[in-house]
Amino acid sequence: KQQITLSRDHAGVKPVYYAEVQQGLVFGSEIKGMLDKVPGSRKLDELAVGCMTTTGINPLRNTFFKGIKKLLAGETIVYDIANKKITNTKRVFVRPNSNKKFDQAEFRKVARESIKMASIGRRKIGVFLSGGLDSSLVAYELKNVLGQANTFTNRMEPNYVHPKDGDHNEDADCAKVLANANNFNH
C-alpha cells in the first residue's frame, strides 16, 4: 500500500513523535533522535510553550521543538509514502464495557481513598481550583481528608473584553464562590 501507520496507545503512556520533512516522514519515541533530521527543530514552538506556561499542560500535537509533533493518546495517522503527506488521522477512545450502574457512595469512597493516597507525605498539597466539577471534587475531598484544602486560581488579563462574555474570568469567580462556601484556604 506504500503507507506508514503510526499509532499511540489509548492511555498515552508511551510517546510517539513525528515530523513531515522534504524527504518524507521522520518518527520516533524520543525527540533527540529527530533533531538533526528536522530542519528548524532546535527552535522553540511558541504555541506549545505558551500553552504550557499559561495552563501547565500541553494538549496540542505541537511539541516544544518547531516542526516536531506528537501523536495524541489513542491517535493513529496514516502517511502516504508516494504523495508524502498524512492522508488519515483518527483518534480512538476506549470505553469501558460495563453494565454496572453508577454508585454514588462507591464513587465517593474511591475518590476519597485516591485523595488520601495522593496526600501522603510531608509536603503541602494544593489544588488549582477552576470552579469546574473535577477540581471542586478534589478540593472538597482533600478538605475531608486533611481537614483543610489549600486552593488557588488564576485571573487573566483579557486581550479583548467581549460585550456579552465579560472579561473571561467567570471560572475564577466560580472558584472563589466555591472556596468561600467550603472554607478553603484560597
Predicted feature locations:
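Cysteine-centered catalytic environments shared across enzyme families
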Residues: 1-186
